[in-house]
Amino acid sequence: ISTQKRNEITFKLFESEVDELITYAKDRNSYFLAISAPINLDVPPKSSCPGSFDESFRTKLDNVIELIKKKDYKLAYSISKELALINNSNARSHFIHGKIAKKLGKDQEALKHLELAAAFDCDNWRSSPVYNSILKKTADKHDAAFFDLHALLQDNASKGVVFMDDIYPQNLYLEKTANTIADRIKKLLKL
């Protein structure tokens, strides 16, 4: 079974499990609060899926990497943008372009490509924008509450270091999240 097929099955299974969990909670008159998983977008993807990179562009990719080493982000930007467009399901191409866009202060473009890099990471070793999207879609379908922790952390990412390692946010952000969730629960329960 191919890596892509395995990931597709994993995502479908996750969607089914979340759907069943929310239905179970609602059937028992319980509140369900879905919380998106934080994703450290500064961590490179572990692997791109087979067949996602056109090898005829290898020279251009090597050129971009050399330009990054020389800190020539402006020249690297146009080449990396082309690579990300042509190899549009390649995690590494999106990651490199996202990092270059971030260096040039193009924050929205950087966020878009770094999220795509995480989504196209074939290793499935951490949370992914795909899981968060499934969670939000399923919560919306059942009219369940949804708290976007990932978006909250990304909003704070420009202000400093948010993550203490590849996966976990700093405790400060977890405390803020806990307080926000507690307030939401109080409103839901009308306390």
What are these regions (language model features)?
Residues 1-137, 142, 152-163:
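Serine-dependent acyl-ester chemistry module
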Residues 26, 104, 181-191:
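Short, hydrophobic alpha-helical segments
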Residues 161-172:
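Conserved PLP-binding active-site segment of the aspartate aminotransferase-like
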Residues 146-148:
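Conserved beta-strand scaffold positions in the cores of enzyme catalytic domains, especially
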Residues 11, 15, 171-182, 186:
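Short, amphipathic alpha-helical "lid/cap" segments that border enzyme active or binding sites
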